[in-house]
Amino acid sequence: MNQIEFEADLRRQGYQVFYGGLQAGMVNPDHAHDWDARVMVIGGEITLTRAAKAETFHVGDNCAVAAGEVHAERVGPQGVAYIAGRRNAVG
């Protein structure tokens, strides 16, 4: 799925779409959100740790984080740019 398709899919599923980025080396310790999130990396990389399992996402990769899911974020050495979707938790 490319960036245009990803954005269209987010909108179809009721996500608010925005573009963002984080600085190189930034670490965000364990936390959770009150919303469902989907993210596609469009520059750099980010590692998410969930349930003690780390997974690194590179350009073109995408992931979903459900509302209430505890996770940590570690940004790669060149930062990360992304397109993201956010929507109120379903249910």
Where are the model-predicted features located?
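Short acidic-glycine-tyrosine-enriched beta hairpin
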Residues: 51-67
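A generic "binding-loop/recognition-motif" signal
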Residues: 24, 34, 53, 69-70, ...
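Ligand-binding loop in jelly-roll beta-barrel domains
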Residues: 67-91
